[in-house]
């Protein structure tokens, strides 16, 4: 197993590569870019590819994975692919059809990991963010424990090897963990996590429950309005990260990625730039000292780039709690 293929064992016995490739891109980026980027990522040594129904790129991502299998670069079992259930399909009877739709778009037989993407439910239908005539989001009321039972059935059916959640706080995780008749625990919780928002409390909670924390926006975030405040600080320009990058002869992005691996976090690196995709797999080639780790810990300032506050209001909105 090459060094680029380090894995963590999940609570269901499956293995997840600790470095993943994120595929989300703002709407104006042509979908063809996802196809090229995923091919480049697999060529560079990424084995873990993260997407979602709502990213609207699973056809391209699936094509990229299948083309790298077809040309002999990788086998299907060497790719760890994650998809996610969007909020318009939380009703239990809609969960499996949503996964089957992703599989059809991907033209794959199974996903390695299927996540509840976001805990707030919206009305079912084709619209991913359904709104009324006044522009108000049409929320739905769904018991996420029932959604979870439908996720468990997807695992039993072999459509997803592992199941987990994303954007859950510790209260919502407890709700699933304490569910009567729980068959499978979530293997992971994928959340925003980076040196400016290091999620220490949530990380400790997840570790105590044998749930892996997976970091998105690990390099800060895209600056896409209206999702991200354009005035928020740019993580990769941080003087501490830049000084460490200079010292290690690496990039600030690599320092931010390495930081997560050393604290036991699985990290997603999103880039559509060929040079940076190749650079990001160098995360296994160096180590940070405990002093350097402490210095990065000290950067935490609870800056959440992606507040998703258009979904605030319903009790399952996850970001009002401390963690």
Curated annotation (Swiss-Prot):
InterPro entries to which the protein is assigned, alphabetical: AKR, AKR1C, Aldo/ket_reductase_CS, NADP_OxRdtase_dom, NADP_OxRdtase_dom_sf
Pathway assigned in UniProt: Steroid metabolism
Expression sites (tissue/organ): Expressed in fetal testes. Expressed in fetal and adult adrenal glands.
Effect annotated for changing residue 90 to Q: In SRXY8; partially impaired activity
Effect annotated for changing residue 300 to T: In SRXY8; partially impaired activity
Outcome recorded upon mutating residue 31 to A/M: Increases the low androstenedione reductase activity
Subcellular location: Cytoplasm, Cytosol
One example GO MF annotation: oxidoreductase activity, acting on NAD(P)H, quinone or similar compound as acceptor
Site, Lowers pKa of active site Tyr: residue positions: 84
Family label: Belongs to the aldo/keto reductase family.
Reported function: Cytosolic aldo-keto reductase that catalyzes the NADH and NADPH-dependent reduction of ketosteroids to hydroxysteroids. Most probably acts as a reductase in vivo since the oxidase activity measured in vitro is inhibited by physiological concentrations of NADPH. Displays a broad positional specificity acting on positions 3, 17 and 20 of steroids and regulates the metabolism of hormones like estrogens and androgens. Works in concert with the 5-alpha/5-beta-steroid reductases to convert steroid hormones into the 3-alpha/5-alpha and 3-alpha/5-beta-tetrahydrosteroids.
Annotated PANTHER family: ALDO/KETO REDUCTASE
Name this protein carries in UniProt: Aldo-keto reductase family 1 member C2
Name of the gene encoding the protein in the UniProt record: AKR1C2
